[in-house]
Amino acid sequence: MSSQIKQVFARQILDSRGNPTIEVEVVLESGAFGRAAVPSGASTGIREALELRDGNKALFLGKSVYKAVENVNTKIAQAVKGLDALDQRLIDKTMIELDGSENKKNLGANAILGVSLATARAAASHLRKPFYRYLMDVKEYLMPVPMMNVINGGSHADNNVDMQEFMIVPAGFDTFSEALRCGTEVFHILKKVLIADGYSVAGVGDEGGYAPDLPSNEAAIEAILKAVKEAGYEPGKHVFIALDPASSEFYKDGKYELKSENKSLTSEEMIDYYAAWVEKYPIVSIEDGLAEEDWAGWKLLTEKLGNKVQLVGDDLFVTNPSILAKGIEKGIANSILIKLNQIGTLTETFEAMAMAGQAGYTCVVSHRSGETSDTIIADLAVATCSGQIKTGSLSRSDRIAKYNQLLRIEEELGENAIYPGIKAFVFNSDEEVEEVVQEIIVEDSEAEKVVVQVEE
């Protein structure tokens, strides 16, 4: 039966924050079916592809996505009907050209991404392959090391903590399932630690982590390490720390304003702030340590800490190959965060990941703070052997859904699932991990082979 697209349909649904988002369904001539829901961020980079919202305050406080839905059901559907779903590059290219803008503002990146992902899912169904294996069919896969956001602050929580995410990284284990068990235990012990220290844990942040009012940002790290020890694990051996300060959110007039500590720091002072933490704590990754427009500061940060920790560009690179290329050329950061909706198509996402791999940058596949029950990023992390994933804490079903999907994939792969542990990080790689990763890193001329595995 034919793999041509027969039907495309979109609807408005709600994300994990109760805000509207778009869900797309694609049906092929063969009857194969694919569905995808698009996430949304709270702290967004200024260069991200445009998420189209209606802006009518009378409807969902201006956040409805009816126009994006209409664009899918009319313009996009007409353009992609009859195209071969197995040709992902053609599908995405068609939508990009139909939109005609640099940031997908006309049709909406949310509309385009929904169709891109739903089409890929339908193609996988047509070939009767698991989605991760459809994206990349290799013998062995790296299971991603999870960065678990157990204390939320910044734009993700209603508290006085400046920095957005304090994460545990259970990298000292042999399997993903063992790492997940460790993370779960530490998360539950952390609640007891915070309560014992007099902090309220009545609510959680957008990504499922606790959101207590703390006397300082460093207090979050201290509480986490205490929980790690009380759970029976050793910091720096079993569990490490990762940070996402999301510093663009507290960068004002050239200074980093840490209100919880009554500090106003220059770029150099902010770098020294992190450097002191790196010496004191088992920190393996810092994401968006400086603001997205502070490229001079990023250069200094990379020179000072780039050989000690993973420095991840999220708002800095926004999963955009052209922006990443500039960062690579200037020696900025050593890792990129991968968020599908920052760039808006599966093809461009793979292009960014291939470019990063060729330059020796790591890739961290990531959720958004406004998530859905869709588990596509779990499959993406495994398919690309990225070795790392950010998908929130150990609560909220929208986060747990991704962890559960990874458990299923690891079980299915058996001995062909490799958990890289600390070796997944740029300053701790080894030959075994590199061997697996090289199977999915290709030259730009072969990027199409990465996007989909087409079987005649």
Curated annotation (Swiss-Prot):
GO molecular function: magnesium ion binding; phosphopyruvate hydratase activity
Pfam families found in the cross-reference section: Enolase_C, Enolase_N
EC number per UniProt: 4.2.1.11
Signal peptide (from-to): none
GO CC terms, sorted: cell surface; extracellular region; phosphopyruvate hydratase complex
Any one of the GO BP annotations: glycolytic process
Pathway involvement of the protein, from the record: Carbohydrate degradation; glycolysis; pyruvate from D-glyceraldehyde 3-phosphate: step 4/5
Localization per Swiss-Prot or TrEMBL: Cytoplasm; Secreted; Cell surface
Cofactor field: Mg(2+)
NCBIfam families assigned: eno
Family: Belongs to the enolase family.
Protein name per Swiss-Prot or TrEMBL: Enolase
Native organism: Francisella tularensis subsp. tularensis (strain SCHU S4 / Schu 4)
Primary gene name: eno
